[in-house]
Amino acid sequence: MLDIKRLRQDFEGIKEKLAHRGEDLSALDRFPQLEEKRRDLINEVEVKKAKRNEATKQIAELKRNKEDAEGPILETRRLGDEIKLLDEELREVEAELNLILLSIPNIPHESTPIGETEDDNVTIREIGTKPEFDFEPKQHWDVMEDLQIVDVERAGKVTGSRFVFYKGLGARLERALINFMMDLHSDEHGYAEVLPPYMVNRDSMTGTGQLPKFEEDAFKVADTNYFLVPTAEVPVTNMHREEILPETQLPIAYTAYSANFRSEAGSAGRDTRGLIRQHQFNKVELVRFVKPEESYEQLELLTGHAEEVLKRLGLPYQVLSMCTADLGFTAAKKYDIEVWMPAQGVYREISSCSNFEDFQARRAGIRFRRDANAKPEFVHTLNGSGLAVGRTVAAILENYQQADGSVVIPEVLRPYMGGKEKIEMPN
């Protein structure tokens, strides 16, 4: 959520910056009119309250003098009724203003590239050596089906499309990756491990920016106030909703594994095979709460932590600075990390690392105090995938596949796989 004071002071300047996102900002056009109406209503209420106070004093004076006070009494009742109606109208205007604020995206940071499409994203660095094959590499869905480490058909029977059963060494590889990522982030990168709920309430989804704008993308539990988590970012960030943190606790860093649930409402026909786009998928998340003056340094740190997973797995990747049109609703600056998929001949997103500045903290009421007498300030929140597990499985299957159909297990995962070095073709 944007700072309403800043919006009042620099409406045209903010609107110009938001226009670089290329989104529909028609709701924002009502802000000046509603803000003027809000001020007028507040002034009118104050005038009527002053008149009512004056009438109340008259009543007291008349009663002291044992004179007729019926006129002022009727006047206070009339003014009270009018104030009540104005207060109700003011609440409606403020609710509409709040809805506008909740629907406006974050202001892009000055370092975010200005662009109109994903083609305007800027490549920051490419890391690793792409594998060379003396055979035609297979797509990861063919690799895993040939190895019989997933069962898509039965998942379709049990649930539907965009679900998968991992089995055997496929299930173990998924679990190995989760444990490896969590160990790396908690033991070496200094994140505190949490295991969050898989359901959250509406306030939590609003706090991190999924609601109200993206409700159609979420899975809501019928006849309840609960949503299945689209990412562990939601429960973990909301751990500190409506809290004032002491400065000495910052930065706070959490890592969390969770299953994630997304409707993929706008993805019909895209990535219908394989592990890239599932309704349910596992992900390891990184979340940081930091002081405002440190947040961009902290974004580089967090992004490096996500990259380290790929480096240790030996997977080639690139880092992109996302342009204004491809930034996402809540981010002021975002890096996407994309892993090389040799059979597809493209890089595919495996992590997004974002600085939300105070956008989420303002929605969720997450503040800190620099000392006991200081006024509370909003923290800056950051998050990133560290990493999406299914997509990491897909990348390993494509990059480590062998001519005989087997897949070499990255060395760093072997302790988590009982020392096994390969996933062999079944007999």
Swiss-Prot record:
EC number assigned by the record: 6.1.1.11
Sites where the protein binds ATP: R262, S263, E264, E349, I350, S351, S352
Protein's pathway: Aminoacyl-tRNA biosynthesis; selenocysteinyl-tRNA(Sec) biosynthesis; L-seryl-tRNA(Sec) from L-serine and tRNA(Sec): step 1/1
GO molecular function: ATP binding; catalytic activity, acting on a protein; serine-tRNA ligase activity; transferase activity
InterPro entries: aa-tRNA-synt_IIb, aa-tRNA-synth_II, aa-tRNA-synth_II/BPL/LPL, Ser-tRNA-ligase_type_1, Ser-tRNA-synth_1_N, SerRS_1_N_sf, SerRS_core, tRNA-bd_arm
Catalyzed reactions per annotation: tRNA(Ser) + L-serine + ATP = L-seryl-tRNA(Ser) + AMP + diphosphate + H(+); tRNA(Sec) + L-serine + ATP = L-seryl-tRNA(Sec) + AMP + diphosphate + H(+)
One CC-aspect GO term: cytoplasm
Residues annotated to bind L-serine: T231, A232, E233, E285, S385
Record keywords, A-Z: Aminoacyl-tRNA synthetase, ATP-binding, Cytoplasm, Ligase, Nucleotide-binding, Protein biosynthesis
Primary location class: cytoplasm
Subcellular location: Cytoplasm
Gene3D superfamilies from the UniProt entry: Bira Bifunctional Protein, Domain 2 (3.30.930.10), Serine-tRNA synthetase, tRNA binding domain (1.10.287.40)
Summary of the function given for this chain in its UniProt record: Catalyzes the attachment of serine to tRNA(Ser). Is also able to aminoacylate tRNA(Sec) with serine, to form the misacylated tRNA L-seryl-tRNA(Sec), which will be further converted into selenocysteinyl-tRNA(Sec).
Subunit structure: Homodimer. The tRNA molecule binds across the dimer.
PANTHER family registered for this protein in UniProt: SERINE--TRNA LIGASE (PTHR43697:SF1), SERYL-TRNA SYNTHETASE (PTHR43697)
Cross-referenced HAMAP family: Ser_tRNA_synth_type1
Domain remark in the UniProt entry: Consists of two distinct domains, a catalytic core and a N-terminal extension that is involved in tRNA binding.
NCBIfam families associated with the record: serS
Protein name: Serine--tRNA ligase
